[in-house]
Each structure stands twice: as C-alpha cells, then as structure tokens.
Amino acid sequence: MVIIGGGPIGLYATFYAGLRDMRALVIDAQDELGGQLVTLYPEKVVYDVGGYPGILAYDLAQNLIEQAKMFSPDIRINEWADMIERTPDNMWIIKTDKGGAFKTKTILIAAGIGKIIPSRLNAKGEIEYENKGVYYTVRRKRDFEGKRILIVGGGDSAVDWALTLSPVAKSVTLIHRRDQFRAHERSVKQMFQVATVYTWHELKEVKGDGSKVTQAVIFDNRTKEEKTLDVDAVIISIGHKGDLGNMVKWGLNMKGRSITVNGKMETNLAGVYAAGDIVEQEGTPKLALIATGFAQAAIAVSVAKKYIDPNASVFAGHSSEMDNKFKK
C-alpha cells in the first residue's frame, strides 16, 4: 500500500498496515513527518486524543512516527505524489516529482489539507532572513528564550504565540493591521497584559546583519508614521494554505478540496482510499479531528487488505491478542 501523507492519519495508517502484514510506502511533500502537528502548532497542547489528558503536538507526532516505524515502512519525505496511472493488470503506478515510480494495488490518501504553505507578506527583507530570524510558526519554544520578538497577525495563532512565548522571551510585541482581532476574546485580553500591542500597524521591512535579524520597521497604516524596533525574531502569523498539487487532476470525485468517500473509505477509483481531513464521507458529518481520522484510517486499511486478498478478514482481531507481532 502506498500512503500519501505523513501527518497523524497517514502515520497511524502506516502502523495499521504493518499490523495487517501489508508493506507500506509513505510519500509526504513536507520536509518532515508529522503534518500540521509539527508544521503549524508543535508547541500547543492537544487534548482530544484518547489516552492523553494533554500532550504537546510535537510529542504526539514523535509518538506516531515511532509507532509507524514499528513495521519498517519505506518513507519518502519532501516528495510530491504527482501522478497516478492505471495499468492493464489493475495496479496503480504513482509517479513523484523526484522521478520515483511505485507500483501498488492500493493507495490511501491521507494528505490532510495538502502541503502546508505559509502566507507571506513579501515585506522587504522577509525572504532574505527566512529561518534567520523570520519564521512562520514556532517549532520549539526554547529557541525564543530571552529574545525580543515581533509577531505579525491578529488571529488565534498570532495571539496564542504571544501568550506562549511571553514567559520565556525578553519581550513580545504584536502588530495587527486592524483594531479587531480574529481570536478568542479571553486570549486577546490576556495578550494585552503580557505583550506590547500596536493596532493599525503593518510590517514594512526586516533588517539584519546578513546572518540574523536585528530590527523591524513597522508603520501605522492610517498615518504612515514609521517605527523601528530592535528585535531578534519576527513571527509572521497571517495564515497558511494547503496545496494538493496535481491530485485534483487524478479523476477523484471531489467536493471542493475534499475527496468523496463511502462508508468503507473507498473513493470512486478502484483500490484508492482516503481518510482524515481530506475526506467528505457520504452521510456522515465532517469532524476534522485526529480521533476521527484514526478510525477512518483503520477502516481504509482493513478494507484495502480485503481488496488485496479476498480471503482475508476485514477485522483481524485486537492488537492485545497479537503479542507475537510486537515481540520480534
């Protein structure tokens, strides 16, 4: 089975495929596994995954990666699943942007919202200092200890980063181009207590010494008055978009950016399944939850196992009865 997507649902599907004695190949367009857990909110706590009263998103991702690797799958990151072709013997060939070509009987699409691409301001110096002081998310809170931080944005993520970093940073300043915030009211009130906030302000320029950020120029978008701030880091948190690449051209039945599946997680293409945030399941409310995606992944893998081997059972039993698989 080829699993497209290395986020939490793809990782769990990889584990479950191994549990069902299926060889798995994971293809992910990001440069690391973990999906949104590591790309968007690694330092935030996830509360709605069974068995964890609360766990850092990054830690949950690492646990899922460890679990996924239990049955030694092949993993290819920073690689797009670009095209699929049907063969005369009813197999699929998946071609990637790196020249890879993989033949498989089944495909599970767990691509989430697609490759996550941060929205950029294109301010002067922004690209030059990307990853040298300009960031679009917070991977590790400790990287910002003792630093003077400027956050750009007015949504939940921007406000949450201000609250998260204020205990460890030397200072936190947040600018927003309006005076109304698209964040939880309570969080906004807390932010004003721990950060310096400039409303009606935007980022004009990021300055540095060539290797790191040293200053940011902001301006009042009503008066055009400029201020130069001494900063060590600029976090631009104005949203992101998901890129599905050429997947939209594969002939899948889609509703908007979602792939339509039935109760068995089957798409309209034989041997192709989907699970997680990317699916729109017929007759079922869409819940964009990790917990929901886990169940969908298990169903998809189990149905795919039966498709590969008609003599196989859809339900192979409980993992607690499979100690031999885990004690090798």
From Swiss-Prot:
Residues that bind FAD: 28, 36, 41, 81, 116, 277, 320
Gene Ontology MF term list: ferredoxin-NADP+ reductase activity; flavin adenine dinucleotide binding; NADP binding
InterPro entries (alphabetical): FAD/NAD-bd_sf, FAD/NAD-binding_dom, Fd--NADP_Rdtase_type_2, Ferredoxin-NADP_redctase_2
UniProt keyword list: FAD, Flavoprotein, NADP, Oxidoreductase
Necessary cofactors: FAD
Catalytic activity, EC: 1.18.1.2
Cofactor note: Binds 1 FAD per subunit.
Superkingdom field: Archaea
Reactions catalysed, as given in the entry: 2 reduced [2Fe-2S]-[ferredoxin] + NADP(+) + H(+) = 2 oxidized [2Fe-2S]-[ferredoxin] + NADPH
Matches recorded under HAMAP family: FENR2
Protein family per UniProt: Belongs to the ferredoxin--NADP reductase type 2 family.
PANTHER family xrefs: THIOREDOXIN REDUCTASE 1-RELATED-RELATED
Quaternary data: Homodimer.
Protein name: Ferredoxin--NADP reductase 1
Species the sequence originates in: Sulfolobus acidocaldarius (strain ATCC 33909 / DSM 639 / JCM 8929 / NBRC 15157 / NCIMB 11770)
